[in-house]
Amino acid sequence: MHLTIIGISDESTPIFSSEVKERLEADGVRFAGGERHRELVETQLPANASWTNITVPLAPFLQEMREYDGAWVVFASGDPLFFGIGNTLRREFPDATVEVFPTFNSLQLLAHKLLLPYGTASVVTLTGRPWQALDKALVDNQKLIAVLTDKVKTPSTIAQRMLTFGYANYTMFLGEKLGGSEERVRELSLEEALTADFIHPNCLYLQQNATRPIRQGIPDAEFQTLEGRPKMMTKMAVRLASLAAMDIRNRSVLWDVGACTGSISIEAKLMNPLLDVHSFEVREESTAIVAANARKFGAPLSYHGGDFGGA
């Protein structure tokens, strides 16, 4: 199998090199890409081109590729090896010969529009991924964060999560349909991003506008506690010893059952921002307390109220 993977932007009529045109005109080649990619390149394909739309889940497309062991041309967005399908195809077809013709990826295009030093950015992809990579960039106090979005983790849901957990100290720079006729670049506060309209595909940069301290080993007195019961929490010495005993920096999931103030959950998340933290508490009053503490200390976590057995 021979794979040619071609990166394109949202430019209405992509300009291809003579080398790429040779691949498009080769005998027996089959084409694949997203529906949007087909709209952009259709006029440059042979009249009888065989095209497969790439959709999620990828299993049917990958099976079709296995059944045709000839030449494939796959279109992708930007740089196919930058969190793109090129990595998937190389993994799934290790014996195939592969050549890649990239263009600027969306984060590069947006950085050029904004004159941002993107080489210093912490890069996060939320495209079909969980929140933990963004959590880590925020907890680690990164000054510039580059984010690839999708139709679920949108600019507004990203802004909502950041505000919920106390990260209001960033400005959002948003790029939509970069490289095309509908291109739009905007600067938004996180509050503005909550209700703004967005065109897909988009990507964004988060630029820090104020620093916040990185907290680990938080004094007990700084936590909000149950009214009238200030001592009802796991004390700092016990928290830190327990988390060390659990080797929390090398774990992926934590269930904190009986979270109360959320002190264990919060310390764990700040020690290991990639940790998927779930806090369970039956007391109704703890809902607001855990939320306030998580926001104060910048610890993104999932809270489950009510009886643990039914959570």
Could you describe each region identified by the protein language model?
Residues 142, 251, 274:
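Phosphate-coordination loops involved in phosphoryl transfer and adenosine-cofactor binding
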Residues 106-141, 150:
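Short, glycine-/small-residue-rich phosphate/pyrophosphate-handling segment
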Residues 251-260:
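Conserved class I S-adenosyl-L-methionine
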